[in-house]
Amino acid sequence: LLNIDKLPGLTTIAQRMTTGIDSFALLAIPFFILAGEIMKRGGIANRLINFAKSLVASLPGGLAYVNVLASMLFGAISGSALAAASAIGSIMTDRMEEEGYPRTFSASVNITSSTTGLLIPPSNILIVYALASGGTASVAALFIAGYLPGILLGLAIMGYIAFIAITKGYAKGKRATLFEVWTFFRKAFFSLMLLVVVVGGIVAGIFTATEASVIAVLYAAVLALIYGDMKMKEFPEVLLNSAKTTAVVMFLICTSMAVSWLFSFEGI
């Protein structure tokens, strides 16, 4: 315990860390992370990967493109780069190794492509930015603004993958027929609809980002149970993993709030 008479600065820092995350808007972060974990366990991530593979796997270095596109789709649904890296990476790393891609290359692609989730809505970072702006920037406006840079970042990563794939002679995958593309799209349709429901609802003003995150959890949970890839007995582990990820993210936010106050107080 601290002597507040002698250490007022440390007391203030602790207060700033606590008040920094005392916001209703920040409740969206743990819920979006939970939605991402449910999608990972519930087979939703697999369906997104298969749909992405049907679109771009025939290009040189095809599985790397699949990784990027699947990360963009998953990040656009879960709102979390961590969730995208975990869900897509846990599936794609082994698949890419089986196809002869170096593990370092597949890991690099997964790490860089997951950052598109920081920009493509619903993004946890944009929610934090809206909060830090003191209300001058709306979440809906930031979400609309995040699409173009997020897509451009994904295309830039794909462009570099094309250069590496051609240089190193990575193999092409099998070209999917229109029927196969339609089949995988149909299987991923309800997963993709989550993006429309969440972002569309926020932009249209039907619900807030926090309310949208709860809807995302309920939608993902029902979908996972319908698909049958996740059982009720797995929910405690899903909640625990989500809590661990949330703890890391929220700790970063509260310490950044304290550092921001410290810089302001010291006139840096």
Give the residues covered by each predicted segment.
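Alpha-helical transmembrane segments of multi-pass membrane transport proteins
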Residues: 1-268
